[in-house]
Amino acid sequence: MKTILQLAGARLILGGGLLAAVVVAGCSDDPVAVDPVTTVQKTGSTDNQQTAAGTVVPRSPQVILFRASGAKAIGETVTFTVEGGGGTVDGAVAVTDTRGIATVREWTLGQIAAANFLKATANGLEVTFTATGIAGPATAVVATLGQEQTALVSTEVAIPPAVRVVDQFGNGVGGQTVLWQVLSGNGLVLGSGSTDSESDGLAQVLGWQLGPTPGQNVLEAAASGFPAVQFTATAIP
């Protein structure tokens, strides 16, 4: 039969073991578990940028992470995802540096001139960057309205010819001067023989009067540095 002293000693040993287990369980070598990331912020200079559609933004988007204690979060993973605009991202997964900052390698905007959005996610938290894609340099002039018309001699065609000045992706480029010139048929350009493209790239002549002789009439639209566009119309008696 165990003595009272032996039983008391066993209880003490058992109790000490439980106490040690509790102490060990309460301690952790993982700083993330006791001081998690609670804040994800954009760095101001990398948000709300503007650049030509289909090109890389000048400043790569960055976020800075903070822990619950207010300390900068080092070594945390941030995922960057394109949310709108059709662009692409290079370096979609980044790790925060000693400053708590994670930077995407490159963000290329979509080819359509429009708003673009990039989301950064870390520890279930997210922020969204916005960038605006605008038309790039003009590369071509294309006919949009008024091709292959027919009208009585010495009268105007029903639809005044129009062209669109576009960049390499087809976005309209404003502020480009278009010159209108009759090439054949002895017709007349009504209004000014020079028009500037609107913000959507559209440039339209006020009117085109065909010549006095039945047959084909040709009108040319040209902008400096690009192949000209020709419109044809048939004058009938």
Where are these regions (language model features)?
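The feature marks long extracellular or luminal low-complexity segments
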Residues: 24-237
